[in-house]
Amino acid sequence: MGIPPNSTAFILSGGGARSAYQLGVLKYIFSEMGCVPESPIFVGSSAGAINAYFLSLRAHHGFSKAIIDLCNIWSSLTVDRVFRTDSWSIVKGVGNFVYNFTIGRYVRQRHIESIFNTEPLYELLKNIIVSEYHFLDKNIEAGSVRALGISAMQYGTGRTITFFQASEKSGIQPWTLLRREGRPAKLRLKHVLASAAIPLVFPSVKIENSYYADGSVRATAPLSPAIHLGGSKILGIGLRTIAQQSQPIENYPSMSQVIAMMLNTVFLDSIDFDVRVLERVNELIEKLPKEERGKLRPIDPFLIRPSEDLGLLSLPYKDCVPKTLKFLMKGLGPTDQRGADFLSYILFDKHYINALIEKGFQDAYAQREILHHFFKKSNQRMKDLP
């Protein structure tokens, strides 16, 4: 069974709590539009890896049910179900860093894995995923999912490794480029956790003989794995609004603003840039005579972005943060509009999560005609537009 001529790939990147926005978009596509992708490809990194893995795991139930189940899981989240928020855990995590930076050079340094203890997230995902590994294997072998790719950054080399699982019949081969590699694997919980391991914030994860960090770090070409896995149509879900109303700051930036800027650079910018590059490459390919194109083929991308700043969307829910974390955030800087971006990454609260899902659903609905045309070109089965 080869790759169909119009394989649709879904790119689910990271962004902490913001990644719930993806669910709203997919909920509209799978449930409201009734789009049933034929052997789709899912590529995930960071929190998007969790979403990609779950949808592939539950594909045998149908994507419309799988996305509803995933929305329910996200809606049940609280910050302390992702990482420990008790006073001792927070003080220990931050204190160990302070210790090593100050007196650690004079006495024995402490082994530090991360600021936050993410054991709750591990337990949550283990209870959901581990007992259903066999469903993922069956779904991929049956063709319900053409391929699943989970990206992580390899410490030491700095290479982005995309671990992928696909049927042997698919003909998908490993790939090696300058800073990127595609490596076949039986995808398990460790791959998901590695992809979501934000450096310093969450602990790195060991796979075979190497340690890995968040897959969005140094991911300069996030569309590349989808193309290597056979996607000729790519739907990406961005987390930065087109009309970003950012203004230069007049006062010296707070620590929370600095951290937010770094996170924005890691999570939000790469996919927008890569889509623009792909569109330009497509233009060049289209100008070539067909007999001169060789193996070159145009890739049809579509990127959905939020119509509203997801950072500002978090402000009405800032009091939902646990007291210990709120105390830490105040030490890093303002918790008003100036600190909204940082807040939006860690605000795993059902009220904010539901607001993100609803916003994603509304934005997909607003672009329903474009989406309908995009999927109809792929001969996907779907409901007629109202």
Predicted segments with their positions:
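Patatin-like phospholipase
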Residues: M1-V43, I50-P386
